[in-house]
């Protein structure tokens, strides 16, 4: 990110569209943790924005597309990017299946079985995070940890639909 200060190339607030509905408590907990972690530590800069942040981000679904609406700290609009959800569908579906297996395994499986399922879960999460980084390339600069937390929020939106 070069000369941009990390204090300016970051998110200070993340909001998920509440009109999509609520997810089960464990999914809502994941949402809250992802947002907390994201605001605490992130790298986020809309490409071409010379003024810099910090930024606020609203994530929503519009016409079955992912909408990332970026504003400045004071609320002035910066940019809205619309992304197709198609590249994420298989990953999210597989991720949910593995998560379901993971939560079932916690109750009855051996530690090595739980660890194997968790490795698969993390692998899918990493794949989704990389896909998001690829889709944001040329639009918004993010680091991998920021992409991971944003992917978690995309999964929450999918769950709510």
From Swiss-Prot:
Q: Which residues cross the membrane?
A: none
- InterPro entries associated with the record: UCP032146
**Pfam families the record matches:** UPF0262 (PF06793)
Q: Which domain of life is it from?
A: Bacteria
What is stated as this protein's family in its record? Answer: Belongs to the UPF0262 family.
Q: Can you name this protein?
A: UPF0262 protein Meso_0189
